[in-house]
Amino acid sequence: MIAPEKLLEAAKALEPQLQEWRRTLHRHPEVGFDLPQTKALVKKALTEMGYTPQDCGKCGVVALAGGKRPGKVILLRGDMEALPLQEESGEEFSSELPGKMHGCGHDMHTAMVLGAAKLLKEHEDEIEGTVKLEFQPAEEIFQGSLDMINSGLLENPKVDAAVMFHVLAGMPLPAGMVLVPGGGITMASCEQYHIVVHGKGGHGSMPNACIDPITAAAHIHIALQEINSRELDPAGFGVFTTGRFEAGKTSNVIPDSADMWGTIRTVDPEQKVSALIHQRMTEIAQGVATAYRCTAEVEFSDYCPCMVVDTPLAGNALTYMTELLGKEAMDMTPLTGGKPGGGSEDFAFVSHEVPTVSMFLAAGNAKEGYTYGQHHPKVRFDDSVLYRGTAAYTYMALRWLAEHQ
């Protein structure tokens, strides 16, 4: 098997190509499952490397490396889609599409896995098993991973272990550092909620002749905070946030309805906390609405489970990343105290099916000029770390397969 230092050199030599892939994707961001240009770039690159990429699900792509020697199967995931966000980063390769931006670094992930695909193809005879390369859409809406699983992602050949990386910007970490979590739940579950409050609209000068849904919705929003502060265990983790509130279109008209959208996050795999939040949100929304002569509908959707990291696989990952990067790979447990993060990731669906590890790659901090974090319109990512991500994906696959015959 190729030595770690030689692999890093080979990955470093790919840097111009990695940056070209990443910056092309960054200029042309696409969201959700609607990724025609992104998918075309991925399939073209894979085909030119000698792969036969296959469609998987609504918009996913998979390809296989190795398979010439018997062994297990390891999955490497790169998500592809952008956010519905207006870019303000100031990068020379900023989004050319209004209202769309690679603000979470998925362009980086796609480029890194394409780089790994190239290195794996060049060392295909050394692969003791099979590497399945996954390019996933719709992570941001928590639908892409499950769609690909339902379309056979983990079968033919059957996957034995799964790996993902996520870049981090704006964190106080040296660029290029790899963080490996311990085992157990590392990220929260997430689901969407939508509350519609129905009243009776009319002229703003005659509120007495109307039933104002805005007033009712505002009181519902305030009343819901009691669930967080008075009904959930302070020692646990359960939080919901209303991030969008819409009502009316004109300043002098009381509308017929008001809408609220938000997210619920917990770290309870049995969903008991989620069930309590569902019950109490519905009771409070409908009860407060009634008090203000309105009605309320509450809907929950797009559930994504907690991310569960396999403890033995995480141990393998820390060993391999240390072999590759030395002190620039670290156990992130001292940073987190072993507690799950509040963010969510739909690769969690895979983690409930096969042993999985989700790692992080630092891609710029404030001292280096990378001030903003993910999902901010001004976020920037240091793409000089791409080769490290490519090397990390590649080494993880080769090393794990060699050790798990």
Model-derived features: positions:
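Metal-dependent amide/peptide-bond hydrolase catalytic core
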Residues: 2, 218-405
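Acidic/His- and Gly-rich active-site-bordering loop/insert found
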Residues: 2-102, 107, 111-128
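Divalent metal-coordination and catalytic microenvironments
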Residues: 25, 63, 76, 106, ...
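Non-cysteine beta-strand/loop elements that form the S-adenosyl-L-methionine
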Residues: 77, 86, 193-195, 358-364
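Short, flexible, mixed-charge acidic loops at enzyme active sites
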Residues: 85-92, 184-189, 317, 364-373
